[in-house]
């Protein structure tokens, strides 16, 4: 048998895997080619500015540790406020490609020209490399959502979830910026995949939850979900087995990852945590005050108002190219150019968003019926879908009064899986109806 025949035989035996890899490659290529079309967000400048921490952390991480009584510079403030993964990831790739970082952080209180003169606008090459490095994580997320879908409802369901994630307008925008939303989404999906496997590896689960949490703190519900799933699976299979071991492993790895990536905590961890929490509360209070004055619709104080805004942003509203109007006049052309592409608004608005909401509700309504027919192996993935949705929704609705579309990114994997479930159920219903008509 020659090499050509061997390759052909291998491809026939691994057709599904080859098809999946090709699909992942095509979607990733599409995302990559569209990077220049994505409008600039000043927070990208901040992440690139802080990416200098990559080299600082390699050379002497102890210098990054915070000490009570010392002055809080802008860099120290960001280390206290923001998770470190994104800036370190960007720093690695900028260092590898020898691209510069901005000289100064972006100052929202100043005008566009003032920030440019200060050197806060990233070099085009640096911005592109930063965005590209975020897109490079996307294949992991696509692979993960396909496998979670397969564990829940089989191959057709997996492909529907794959398509819905890859074409989601919120994902298209926010995972092609040099910001935290891309890593947050990918590590969250990988965690769901690991939890859905027949045998859960607590070491890997602790690692991916640690990476997700250190991309964005709103992913913390993943930790609660993992602990619940590990307890549930271990207790169900063997009540006498010491389930505590797996939980301890997850917690230890999670804490080790967080400590390793946050040298700001190393010298005075408790005092630093208190300072970080206080800084986060002050920032949130300031944001609420600013947006309440500038755009009251961006602030939702009551739970019903937050539910309304959540549904509006994840289903109906166009991609939110910017949360604040500071630089709208300067960036308006880029906003309109981006939104002029139909693919960037796919399944949004009254019709598209209404269809996605209908698919999601259908998925929720048909779950009990499907669950009765599903094999026992799908019980845990379904529990992950239900438990994860409830936990993540509770945190977002209970903690986040600001209506920033990108703040809802942690819910996107669950939304995609619910909508895929509804669409798959609809296909099944129509298929059965067609077969009955055909037989007659």
Where are these regions (language model features)?
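Perimembrane helix-loop-helix junctions
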Residues: 2-6, 193-203, 209, 221-256, ...
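Transmembrane-helix signature of polytopic, membrane-embedded enzymes
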Residues: 16-23, 102-117, 145-167, 199-204
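Transmembrane alpha-helix segments characteristic
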Residues: 22-25, 160-161, 352-397, 415
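Short acidic/glycine- and proline-prone juxtamembrane loop motifs at membrane-interface regions
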Residues: 40-42, 170-183, 404
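Interfacial juxtamembrane loops and adjacent helix segments
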Residues: 49-133, 276, 281-347
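Transmembrane-helix motifs of polytopic, lipid-linked glycan transferases
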Residues: 120, 124, 132-153, 190, ...
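Hydrophobic, aromatic-rich transmembrane alpha-helices
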Residues: 140-145, 328-377, 438
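Specific aromatic-rich, kink-prone transmembrane helix
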Residues: 144, 163, 183-200, 208-209, ...
């Amino acid at each position: 048998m020659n090499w050509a025949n061997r390759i052909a035989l291998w491809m026939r035996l691994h057709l599904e895997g080859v098809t999946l890899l090709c699909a992942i490659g095509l979607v990733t290529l599409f995302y990559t080619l569209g990077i220049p079309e994505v409008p600039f967000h000043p927070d990208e400048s901040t992440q690139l500015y802080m990416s200098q921490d990559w080299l600082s952390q390699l050379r002497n991480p102890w210098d990054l540790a915070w000490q009570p009584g010392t002055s809080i510079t802008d860099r120290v403030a960001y280390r206290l406020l923001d998770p470190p993964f994104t800036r370190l990831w960007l720093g690695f790739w900028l260092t590898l490609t020898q691209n510069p970082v901005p000289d100064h952080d972006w100052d929202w209180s100043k005008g566009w020209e003032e920030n440019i003169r200060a050197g806060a606008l990233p070099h085009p090459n640096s911005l592109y490399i930063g965005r590209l490095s975020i897109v490079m994580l996307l294949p992991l997320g696509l692979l993960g959502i396909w496998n979670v879908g397969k564990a829940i409802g089989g191959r057709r369901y997996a492909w529907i979830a794959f398509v819905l994630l890859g074409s989601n307008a919120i994902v298209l925008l926010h995972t092609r910026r040099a910001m935290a939303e891309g890593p947050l989404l990918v590590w969250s999906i990988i965690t769901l995949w690991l939890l859905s496997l027949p045998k859960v590896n607590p070491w890997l689960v602790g690692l991916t939850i640690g990476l997700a949490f250190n991309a964005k703190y709103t992913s913390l519900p993943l930790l609660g979900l993992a602990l619940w799933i590990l307890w549930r699976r271990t207790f169900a299979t063997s009540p006498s087995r010491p389930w505590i071991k797996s939980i301890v492993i997850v917690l230890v790895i999670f804490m080790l990852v967080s400590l390793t990536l946050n040298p700001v905590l190393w010298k005075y961890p408790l005092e630093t945590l208190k300072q970080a929490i206080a800084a986060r509360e002050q920032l949130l209070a300031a944001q609420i005050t600013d947006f309440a004055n500038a755009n009251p619709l961006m602030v939702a104080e009551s739970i019903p108002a937050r539910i309304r805004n959540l549904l509006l942003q994840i289903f109906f509203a166009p991609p939110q190219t910017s949360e604040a109007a500071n630089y709208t006049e300067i960036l308006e052309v880029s906003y309109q150019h981006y939104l002029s592409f139909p693919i960037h608004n796919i399944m949004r608005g009254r019709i598209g968003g209404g269809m996605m909401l209908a698919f999601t509700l259908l998925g929720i309504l048909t779950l009990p019926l499907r669950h009765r027919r599903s094999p026992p192996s799908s019980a845990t993935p379904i529990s992950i879908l239900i438990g994860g949705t409830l936990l993540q929704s509770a945190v977002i609705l209970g903690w986040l009064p600001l209506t920033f579309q990108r703040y809802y990114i942690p819910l996107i994997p669950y939304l995609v899986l619910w909508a895929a479930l509804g669409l798959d159920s609809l296909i099944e219903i129509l298929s059965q109806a067609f077969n009955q008509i055909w037989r007659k």
